[in-house]
Amino acid sequence: MNLFYNLGISLYSAAVGIAATRNNKARLMKAGQAQTFGILAEKVDTSASYIWIHVSSLGEFEQGRPLMEMIKKHTPEKKILLTFFSPSGYEVRKDYPLADVVCYLPMDKPSLVRRFLDAVKIEKAFFVKYEFWGNYLSELKRRGVPTYIISAIFRPTQAFFKWYGATFRRMLGCYDMLFVQDEESRALLAGIGVDNVVVAGDTRFDRVTDILEDHTDLPVVESFSRGAFTLFVGSSWQPDEDFIIPYFNKHPEMKMVLAPHEISEDRISGILTGLKRPAVRYTKTTPEEAAEADCLIIDCYGILSKSYRFATVAYVGGGFGVGIHNINEAAVYGIPVVFGPKYGKFKEARDLIALEGAFTVSGGDEYALVMNRLLSDGEYLKKHGEFAGGYIRDNLGATRRIYDAIFK
């Protein structure tokens, strides 16, 4: 990569180091990257080759996961190296059983890149969705390692398509194949001369069908929601709750499960203060107590996606911040999904709105209009839920298309 790119990486690395003195996420990243080469020395089988899957965070992990599962299903002898950029992915999935080695990806500095690739014999490399690291890509190409990006999605606003984007366009030339989510991405790439592109779809759809088939017993959630119109609020933030909770307080004909994105005693306490109806916490209640409550607060991680099967309607948070969280996990159950206005980067959100399987709201007034109709009109509720579930079913198969193109 050129001098300016490498300077940018060095400045970013320095910024992480400074932030680590006061920010826990940066602290975890810095400490985790410092452990990477020790993990590789301890766990890598130097006589074997590895399929390398790199993801940024937890959401991208869920896109890479179906491919890892398919690789292990058909070729269990293959070894997988899984790397993360963000602590929010690594800290949750560092013990993922299908990966033989899991670690942080070192910063994209030439010396670290060479050291990393010298430590592991890479058979094939897969980057997921948005991961474009110029030094890794150019070094993989120089070494002749087949390299792919999966579930990628491109937008006209990205640097690849700007007059100043030559450095970033060169990165695209390092991929043997780009598997994109939609035709719009393929057309954008064709416009800059990139034609080794396959419209395969989004592997996350295949992941959510696995969730659909997971019948883990959740007696507290099941007992709480039985026979009631139950709104599930997933991965909520304060701006979401500012209008969801007041509406809930005024509508005794509904129940609510609320799962905040960040769980802390302060967050839970604030939610409980705002609620004017009986509420219980998931970790501190029984099925019998939950059945008598009006609101169930999910104060632990790992059960939200499985819990949506008990929902009547889902609201997915994040739409008043950096962007909405995973809406497919709810839509797969054939229920309408509601979210805030910052959804433009997410193809599935745009598609679901166009198909009327989802609704976007910009505040409390619009939210009330949507919820009033869903609460009062059973046929309307059923119809829009069917639109959501049908969209998920129609978009299955990306993992198989990618696997067959590379491994068959």
Predicted regions and their residues:
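Active-site and donor-binding regions of nucleotide-sugar-utilizing enzymes
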Residues: 17, 21-214, 232, 237-238, ...
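Acidic donor-binding loop of glycosyltransferase active sites
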Residues: 120-124, 291-322
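Structural loop-to-beta junction motif characteristic of Rossmann-like glycosyltransferase folds
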Residues: 145-146, 312-313, 332-341, 357
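A short, well-ordered alpha-helix in the C-terminal region of glycosyltransferases
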Residues: 380-394
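C-terminal alpha-helical cap of glycosyltransferases
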Residues: 395-408
